[in-house]
Structure formats: structure tokens, C-alpha cells
Amino acid sequence: MGRKEMMVRDVPKMVFLISISFLLVSFINCKVMSKALYNRPWRGLVLSKIGKYKLDQLKLEILRQLETTISTKYNVSKQPVKNLTMNMTEFPQYYILAGPIQNYSITYLWFDFYSTQLRKPAKYVYSQYNHTAKTITFRPPPCGTVPSMTCLSEMLNVSKRNDTGEQGCGNFTTFNPMFFNVPRWNTKLYVGPTKVNVDSQTIYFLGLTALLLRYAQRNCTHSFYLVNAMSRNLFRVPKYINGTKLKNTMRKLKRKQAPVKEQFEKKAKKTQSTTTPYFSYTTSAALNVTTNVTYSITTAARRVSTSTIAYRPDSSFMKSIMATQLRDLATWVYTTLRYRQNPFCEPSRNRTAVSEFMKNTHVLIRNETPYTIYGTLDMSSLYYNETMFVENKTASDSNKTTPTSPSMGFQRTFIDPLWDYLDSLLFLDEIRNFSLRSPTYVNLTPPEHRRAVNLSTLNSLWWWLQ
């Protein structure tokens, strides 16, 4: 009987504890909901089902006004009748910047319209946010999702206009990511639903460039937004990059690309000094023969790498370059991806004909402002004047000015990364010619490619004089 009385007395306490727990849980949930509400791109009160339905219908109506048909060529799109402007009291949270954030003027960006509200894939619209008027202007049509070739093409079109507020970076230098001494292989990348045929050197270059230019924005806060936006179509670059790890990685790669030290030279000299030629005591002619033989043996035993063959009298090929030069070269390489996809790479294409990729890339050799499918690009930062020794005037470059002497002349030439890129095109052309001849000639040996020594070496490219 006493136990029942105690249980009856404990009932109010249990009810009290349960009610307190319920209030505490509801309070925590309210805080979580308010925090989630604060992070929404369209902020406001918690809507009912009817309110959410009306908001979704409003978004879909705006998207319907933005949608237009995009033609098959990426640089030509059907222009809408007008842009769409709406109020937005705060800067959006889901975006890809096309230029620096300018708090007292206009910021250019690709706005993620769907965000997380409609639970659909991101759909980016090129927009302008006015910080003074607190409005956002959509400039249709939307390019679609990222990654995709349509968004990459729109980013290249915007970079051609150069009206997003990007500025130069002065004399800021960075590492050279155009490696020449790398294994060569081809693969297919999915840029959204599109397959793109890419070689290994292009992947290494664009991937390392994305890291270097993202890190360079710490010093150049008004630069490299467009090329970093392009990189999001191929790579997932972290927002924050460890500078120490990046520098150590690039230095290791740089040492591997540098000329190989003559490790066998001392050993060869020691062997030569201890070895007594068999005919050294007879005649001078025999002495010359044995000396030549000994020299040829030491030369064969010494390792000769492709990186030891230079076209510059420098001790290292991987010198630092200007960050703006790296940006311009990366922009050019992104334009070439258009010609590495279908229908230009169909299996049923004529393999003996000139590829569209070669037709597009050859214009950079003779023209500093080449015309591309996205318009004219200014690549003048990739060239410079150099005084070079000219042995034969008729075979020299036609772009040189009047020489100061019969053996010297000024010549317009390329910076090191562009030279290595053109040399890789020569290597690809050699592989292409070998693959075309191998079915006919069974015992052909693969070509051994060495880096181009001078401009005359690149003349073997069929499109050099086009």
C-alpha cells in the first residue's frame, strides 16, 4: 500500500520532467529551424504548404522567362527580349564569381538559381548584383549546370569581353606548370554530359594552373576570377589551399623537370683514366683510334635525357612565369577543348584529313591575337622579342626585323610554356603519322621525340606555314 502511494506521489514529478524535456527539445528545434531559415537564399518566415507552393511557382515563372533556346554552336545564342531585374536585399549565397566583389558598385557572377530550395541540380544564370540599389539583374539564357560545355563556353565568351572588373596582377610570378617530360596518354573526360578527348599534358597543365591561380588570388584579389570559374568545369578545386604543400609539390616537380646532372661523368672519367689503351704505345694513328673508341664508350654509358637538350642556354627549363601569362595561356587551352569533343572526334571521321583541333591551334603560332570560335583573344603576353643567331636568312623567320649584322637578327618568339605546348603538338603529330603508317609497315619502331631545339625544328609541322 505504501509503494502505491509513493508511485502516485511521483506521477506529477514525472509529468513535470517530461514537459521540461519537451520544451527543451522544441526550443532546440526552433533554433535549428531559425538558423536554417537564415541560410536560405530567399529569407522570410516559415511558409505554409500553400506559401511554399506559391514561392516555387514564382521561381518557376522567373525561370520560364529566362529560358531561351541555345543554338548548336556555343558562341551563338538566341538573345531574349529583355533582362530581368528583381529586388534582393542581401548578396546571394550560392554563386560563381565572374569578377571581384565590389561593395559600392556592381558585382558580376553566375547565380545558382535553383540553390537548395527546389531540390534540383544547380542552374547558373549570368547576373549582375547592384550593391547600391540592392537588386540583381539576370542576363539570360542560363548556361545550365557546372560542369558543362555550355557554361564553359559562356565563361570564355565573358572573358573575351573583359568587362567584369578584373584587373592585372602586376609583376607577380608563379610556377610554370607546363611540364614536357611527362608520360603521354589520352583519355576521355566528362564535362557534364559531354565527352572530351584530352591528353595527359593538358590535364596536368590545367589542373596545376587551377591550383596556382586559386592560390595567387591571395596576393591578387582582383584577378583570375574567370579562369578559376572555367576550372570548375573540369576540377574540384578547394576554396582554401595550403601554400606550403603547394610550393613543396611544385618544387619537387620542378626538380624532376630540370636537366639531369651528369651522374655517370665522374665514374666514366675514372674508368677512362685507369684503362690503358691496347695500341697506345705504337703509333699516333692507333692512339687516335683508341681515344675515339674510349670516348664513344663513355658517351654511350652516360645517360642522356630529353630534358638535357635545350633550346635556351639556361641551366633550368622550369623558370617562373608571370601569373597573367599563365592566365592567358590557360584561357587559350580551354578554347581548344571545343575541338576535342564530338562531333569532331567521331570514330567514323576521316582520320587522314586535317583535324579541326589542328586547324584551330596553328593560328597561335603566327598571330598574337588569334580568332577562335569564341571571338578574338589577346595572347600578346605570350610573345617577346629575342636576338637570335641567324645562319641562313632565307630560312629564318619572316617576322624578324632588319638584322643589325649579317649573323644576328630580332625575332618574335614564345615564352617557355607556350614553346613546350607547341612542341607537344609536334609530338602528337609524330604519333599521328606513326599510327597511320604502322598498319602498312609492321616492323616500324615508334618515334623518339626530343624537344625542339629552335624554330626551324618546328617547321616540320605541316601547318607551320599555313
Swiss-Prot record:
The answer to whether the entry has keyword Ion transport is no
Q: How is it modified after translation?
A: N-glycosylated. The N-terminus is blocked.
Alphabetic keyword roster:
Glycoprotein, Membrane, Signal, Virion
Q: Where in the cell is it found?
A: Virion membrane
What family is reported? Belongs to the herpesviridae U47 family.
Quaternary structure, from the entry: Forms the envelope trimer complex composed of gH, gL, and gO. The trimer interacts with host PDGFRA.
- Primary role: Plays a role in viral entry into host cells. Forms a trimeric complex at the surface of the viral envelope together with gH and gL. This complex is required for entry in host fibroblasts. Mechanistically, engages host receptor(s) including PDGFRA to mediate infection.
| Stated name of the protein | Glycoprotein O
Identify the coding gene: GO
